[in-house]
């Protein structure tokens, strides 16, 4: 089990945690943002250290014990049950980043695509709210100008 294997397996585990725990507890935006933070943590570090990872990536501290419990339950499936430190393989981070779904699909046939390169933008410039009058959720997106494509 080399660093490539460990990096991919740990990120796949994070993906499942995001889908099975973060999404039901929060929403699709938070699921995508969690994976954004996880990928970026791996991208900017050469060594993985689980405590530092959890402190940086978990914006909701209540998810830290849930993550640890989830790792006890599902870690063996990803061969990471006893792993908390390993060297990070940058090529593996790039491979996993390509496979991630970063689109919020709404029931109104509208899709919002969030960029994995700059996750801070999604947190700073996208807000979710509830409209009492329409009895619907909405996303509010802030920007300076549209890019002509």
Positions of predicted regions on the chain:
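C-terminal, beta-strand-rich globular interaction domains
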Residues: 69-149
